[in-house]
Amino acid sequence: MSRKRSTKPKPAAKIALKKENDQFLEALKLYEGKQYKKSLKLLDAILKKDGSHVDSLALKGLDLYSVGEKDDAASYVANAIRKIEGASASPICCHVLGIYMRNTKEYKESIKWFTAALNNGSTNKQIYRDLATLQSQIGDFKNALVSRKKYWEAFLGYRANWTSLAVAQDVNGERQQAINTLSQFEKLAEGKISDSEKYEHSECLMYKNDIMYKAASDNQDKLQNVLKHLNDIEPCVFDKFGLLERKATIYMKLGQLKDASIVYRTLIKRNPDNFKYYKLLEVSLGIQGDNKLKKALYGKLEQFYPRCEPPKFIPLTFLQDKEELSKKLREYVLPQLERGVPATFSNVKPLYQRRKSKVSPLLEKIVLDYLSGLDPTQDPIPFIWTNYYLSQHFLFLKDFPKAQEYIDAALDHTPTLVEFYILKARILKHLGLMDTAAGILEEGRQLDLQDRFINCKTVKYFLRANNIDKAVEVASLFTKNDDSVNGIKDLHLVEASWFIVEQAEAYYRLYLDRKKKLDDLASLKKEVESDKSEQIANDIKENQWLVRKYKGLALKRFNAIPKFYKQFEDDQLDFHSYCMRKGTPRAYLEMLEWGKALYTKPMYVRAMKEASKLYFQMHDDRLKRKSDSLDENSDEIQNNGQNSSSQKKKAKKEAAAMNKRKETEAKSVAAYPSDQDNDVFGEKLIETSTPMEDFATEFYNNYSMQVREDERDYILDFEFNYRIGKLALCFASLNKFAKRFGTTSGLFGSMAIVLLHATRNDTPFDPILKKVVTKSLEKEYSENFPLNEISNNSFDWLNFYQEKFGKNDINGLLFLYRYRDDVPIGSSNLKEMIISSLSPLEPHSQNEILQYYL
């Protein structure tokens, strides 16, 4: 018999621990293979035995997040973090937590856990790449450079790593190091570039030249080196336009104007429709101020490129002789009208904007003379498009009757062209007839139901006319409406900012209309007889709901815009690595520049300014708390203490009816799936107790961090800081406004008067801040304002404003009107002054001010 060799038995705890770790590693592999449910099953088995197994808690949170159970995922991750002392967990646990935080877009936390994974002994060098990506996302380029370098050291065989290191060095101002990095790889890859890699190689060569050019600045020797490098790489570069433009710029900096002009002529030959090249050619030839030489130049260029616009158009911008200019205008405009070019007016509109007094009467005479010689039957194409041109001409001059006359002539002749309906609607819009304008566009839309442009234009006009239901109906013809009654959800999904902002503004206007009607009904209720009071009470309840609904929906739609822009910002995350893999460093740097000004884009700023009206009003209403004001947020009218059972029963019945109505109406206004949105009407938004904090978080903070000083809206800054009690910042905004627009501006006067009155003893602002602002006003503007009259209640500030700043600055007057409760100005007199100053404005602007501002 053989004797069994005796072995020392392993402790049970160690066996269990090894089994647990094996199970965890298996669960981790399943997660990596996207088999989340199987991974969860293994993790549940581990946690059943040891509920404090931190690695399993973290991985389970990540698994749950991956299957969509985000609330449970957050709970497990929070539990795991609670059990960790500081960041002293296993490298795998820290890595898992880093991935989870990245998925939830908590980038700073993700960086913390990825760093912890490396500090705790992780050998996974891929973490450096993820770390660099996240650091780039939050703008921490200094640490991103460290991470890029570590990753590059670990994986030297990939060009993307060399490119990403060079980009990181460039962004951190280490330009020579970036050049050296790119040059080093070029030496290693010399003669080994395959056809599929040639584009990437071309981009990296041009990127290297970009860095050299930035580093050279105006140094002549360095610029010569940049030029030499450009000539050396020219055969390998695909972007010939970029290369030639750079070459011409360097020649200009070196003073080699003749060489620069040759390059610009080459660029014009390659793309004769680019206006920029012609203007730069003028500069390189040194003839910008010599109209005679410019005329000769463009005469020759027109012969070389007879079918191109710039040589024909540019002389129209500088010719001074009336007869010569008239001749050139005739040669430029009439052939287009003969061919029936719809964009003829658009082509010459820059001339109207820059040389209105000289060009406008000449073109009017030329085109009217041309029209008088046309036969509508024999020359139908020139006839209709000449009328179309003249209608646009008179619309630009704000001669609306004549504009209507000519577009009607075109429509009477050919009522089947959509462009004519669009122009007629524009004219009616300027006249303030929004309902009629929308109706005209609807007629035009019916002519071509497959045209998305006319569809969107019609939607926009219906929204401007406050006909939201019809606008949504028309917009929904081009949306996916699989799981909803209209296209609202799809328009949010595709981030159609133009529609959402227009709809928000329409809701805001409806809110103002209903609020005004509600105030009128409340006043009427006190005056009418008892037999009519019940009907009025019902009308009040109806309007209360509509006020609340429109206000909430307006704010809801405005708040959708920053969500889109946050998504745009988050979308950059993938490109921090994608652009390096694809070898497009120049495009990547353009994206970084775009991201730095993301929250200053026109649509975002427009939504922010409109939303500020609601947030500021909510803040002001909250502060007033007048006992005699009608509370628009309540669901029912106060019943003077009567609490009979019949009234309670009635109230209960009304509440049930309202809930049913909300359910019905929610289907047509819901912007998101029901499981993602529990506040369809935005009621929680308008019930906030912190409107200014909400405005700052949603809009203002991002805007304020990114906006350039020369683009900043100082009025918005002033109003925001005024409401949060930061008078010193209000003065700073006033001061900057004065430097940009002068101290004669009506808006400057209005802002200063409001700020002056904020320093009175009876205002709720900080006494120290009031003293600081008073001293600042005395120092800077003592000659502009009667500062000693600030405590004089009988002083006529409106008369002072009128004498000092005039009475025609409508924006300044409207600003004063908004703060009429804070400044002792007779609101009726101010209102009369505003109305009397409306005459220079277009009818639609007059209507808007009368209806929504006063």
UniProtKB/Swiss-Prot annotation:
Task: Show the GO MF annotations.
Answer: acetyltransferase activator activity; ribosome binding
The record's section on SMART domains has: TPR
Q: Which residues carry this modification: Phosphoserine?
A: S674
Question: Which SUPFAM superfamilies would you find in this protein's record?
Answer: TPR-like (SSF48452)
The known PTMs are summarized as:
The N-terminus is blocked.
Keyword Protein transport applies = no
Q: N-acetylserine: which positions carry it?
A: S2
| Disulfide topology | none
- The TPR repeat units are at 20-53, 54-87, 91-124, 126-162, 241-274, 384-417, 452-485, 728-761
Q: Origin, by domain of life? A: Eukaryota
Q: Name one GO cellular component term.
A: mitochondrion
Q: Where is this region: Disordered?
A: 626-668
- Sorted alphabetically, which InterPro entries does this protein's record hold? NatA_aux_su, TPR-like_helical_dom_sf, TPR_rpt
Q: Print the keywords alphabetically.
A: Acetylation, Coiled coil, Cytoplasm, Phosphoprotein, Repeat, TPR repeat
Q: How does it assemble?
A: Component of the N-terminal acetyltransferase A (NatA) complex, which is composed of ARD1, NAT1 and NAT5. Can self-associate. NAT1 associates with the nascent polypeptide chain and the ribosome.
Additional remark text = Present with 7600 molecules/cell in log phase SD medium.
Can you say what this protein is called?
Answer: N-terminal acetyltransferase A complex subunit NAT1
Q: Which organism is it from?
A: Saccharomyces cerevisiae (strain ATCC 204508 / S288c)
Q: What is the lineage of its organism?
A: Eukaryota, Fungi, Dikarya, Ascomycota, Saccharomycotina
This protein's encoding gene: NAT1
